[in-house]
């Protein structure tokens, strides 16, 4: 019985860390996009309350947690990283997990550096995607692109050339084939202590106040999400253990996801963006608490009305490896997909898309494509046709 109680309390602590991370991101993203004075004050208060939630379970004091949260200046999304699986000459497999950051080099640079050190080929594409949120780790939400390498070095020699795994990425983190990565997290009902319920009630009151005062559709969506999170928690008597919730100051390389949806004739669905009038693959920012594959599926539905399933990963697209450096959202996970029902009609989101078109590869060459999509659209066609 004592073991069962301890396990339940541990799950509740990790769940609270996850919730705090989601609310941290909602506050940071709302502040990034800008708001009026009253809404900005509410978002800053949300940030404070999110830090107070984490202080119920993390070993660090509230002031330290809040300082980390207040340092957020960019968009917060699941953080990209790599899981390198290196098969050595002596039969040992080494595994190294590290996040990407804005200062430690691009995805392409990391792969090239590691391959050169191990005297092996640069891996061309990830074999799987791992996700710390799906694994139940309490660290900031991170997805890991899994690459496999082989080296003629033995394990001690190879290990000496590699940076160690970041401590908060240690543990059992299952990986999924990219085509199967649109997993809906099932963490169950979050059990919370009475003091946490009080904090969530305060957050829900902020959301209610925002909904009464703001007409901005994106901010209203945000506040509805926040209110739903607060409502889903269930108060109970429990005692939280103190846990390590990972590197709260880890640099977030903001990540988006898109879905290149193909029909049975091999045509690609593009939308005309309402803001620029250019053509693009449906996509947008990934949200903390959702796998990047699920973000691609969600964005396709929100912008086109189509229910889709992933068929693969076209490109883990680090814009910093191109001339399209983008401080706002440097990383894009570009998936291929198909509609679950080929007869399902399109239903465009007017705020996002003014038109949509199924196009061939040849037709795509004559379109005015949104920045970055001039690279991603040909890559999607090549992936769909099995050319890469």
Residues of each region from the PLM?
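Nudix hydrolase/Nudix homology domain
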Residues: 2-43, 142-236, 278, 350-388
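Conserved Nudix-box catalytic region and its N-terminal flanking loop in Nudix hydrolases
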Residues: 85-121, 263-302
């Amino acid at each position: 019985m004592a073991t069962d109680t301890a396990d339940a309390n541990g799950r509740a602590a990790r769940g609270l860390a996850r919730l705090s991370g989601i609310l941290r991101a909602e506050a940071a993203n709302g502040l990034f996009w800008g708001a009026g004075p009253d809404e900005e004050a509410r978002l800053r208060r949300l940030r404070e309350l999110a830090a107070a939630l984490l202080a119920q379970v993390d070993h660090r004091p509230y002031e330290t947690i809040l300082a980390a949260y207040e340092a957020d200046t960019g968009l917060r999304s699941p953080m990209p990283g790599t899981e390198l699986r290196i098969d050595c000459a002596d039969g040992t497999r080494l595994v190294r997990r590290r996040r990407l950051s804005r200062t430690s080099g691009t995805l392409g640079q990391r792969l090239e550096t590691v391959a050169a050190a191990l005297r092996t080929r640069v891996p061309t594409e990830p074999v799987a995607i791992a996700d710390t949120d799906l694994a139940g780790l309490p660290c900031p939400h991170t997805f890991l692109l899994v690459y496999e390498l082989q080296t003629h070095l033995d394990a001690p020699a190879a290990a000496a050339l590699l940076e160690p795994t970041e401590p908060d990425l240690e543990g059992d983190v299952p990986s999924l084939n990219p085509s199967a990565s649109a997993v809906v997290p099932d963490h169950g009902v979050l059990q919370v202590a009475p003091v946490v319920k009080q904090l969530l009630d305060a957050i829900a009151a902020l959301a209610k106040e925002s909904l009464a005062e703001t007409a901005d559709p994106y901010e209203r969506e945000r506040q509805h999400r926040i209110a739903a999170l607060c409502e889903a928690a269930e108060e109970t008597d429990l005692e939280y253990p103190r846990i390590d919730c990972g590197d709260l100051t880890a640099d977030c390389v903001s990540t988006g996801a898109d879905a290149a949806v193909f029909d049975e004739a091999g045509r690609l669905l593009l939308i005309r963006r309402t803001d620029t009038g250019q053509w693009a693959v449906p996509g947008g920012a990934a949200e903390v608490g959702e796998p990047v594959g699920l973000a691609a599926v969600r964005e396709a539905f929100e912008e086109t009305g189509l229910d889709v399933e992933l068929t693969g990963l076209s490109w883990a697209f680090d814009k910093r490896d191109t001339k399209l450096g983008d401080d706002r959202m440097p990383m894009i996970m570009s998936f291929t997909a198909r509609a679950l029902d080929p007869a399902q009609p399109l239903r465009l989101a007017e705020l996002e898309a003014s038109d949509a078109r199924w196009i061939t590869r040849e037709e795509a060459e004559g379109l005015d494509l949104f920045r970055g999509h001039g690279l991603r659209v040909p890559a999607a066609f090549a992936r769909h046709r099995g050319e890469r």
